[in-house]
Amino acid sequence: MIMYCKLCSNNQLTQVNSSDNRNYFLCPNCNLISVSPDNFISNKEEKERYLTHNNGIEFKGYVDFLNIAIEPALQFLKKDMLGLDFGCGHTPTLSKLLAQHGFNCEDYDPFFVENNLNKKYDFIFSTEVFEHFLNPQKEISKLVNLIDKNGIIVVMTDRWNDINQFNSNWHYARDISHVVFYHNKTFDFICNEYNLEMLYDDKSRVVILRKN
């Protein structure tokens, strides 16, 4: 099987040494590391895994975690904006937290919450979702198309910075539902490719992008 990058379509990938039984490939063009489709789990297994997560506003740890993305984003949001939580999980929580700040945010999740996504949004949060994209080019294009001009996209996903992380016990790679891993340079590529401006970057987990 010929491997190609699911973000930039480059077909000159290099295999990454890993400490598990999955096959990882690095794209030297955009620095995305992806798992071979041979190692993907089924939709049923993926959904069952999500159902084990303690999501909900009653879980302080989960709320604190979501606030890592919410707090830096507040400076870019206005009360008349309409938002979307893209990949909200089985118990939508981020939209409830934003409501406490006076913001209107709809929910969507391909497994748990239907939304026909037939409108434009002023902001989109996608927390702990990008690493699950089987086809990041397709999904990121969808997100960008859902955002109005000058709209904001808030992304939370743990980034890799050392190739040796995949040959260690890095928790992000050991989660079998995680199939793509982003680098700082990957987000530089995304900004250039989709005409986005980087408004905020914590160099670790959260980026905030604006559509030009």
Would you name each region that the model predicts?
Residues 194-212:
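Core SAM-dependent methyltransferase catalytic element
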Residues 140-149:
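A short glycine-rich, Lys/Arg-flanked "PGG" loop and its adjoining helix->strand segment in the class I
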Residues 127-130, 156:
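Residues lining the SAM
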Residues 131-135, 182:
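Residue-level signal for the nucleotide or nucleotide-sugar donor/cofactor binding architecture
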Residues 1-123, 127, 138-140, 174-175, ...:
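Conserved N-terminal segment of class I S-adenosyl-L-methionine
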Residues 157-180, 185-186, 190:
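Short, glycine-/aromatic-enriched active-site segment of Class I SAM-dependent methyltransferases
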Residues 82, 150-152:
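Short glycine-centered segments of the SAM/dcSAM-binding site in methyltransferase folds
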Residues 78, 134, 148:
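Short conserved AdoMet
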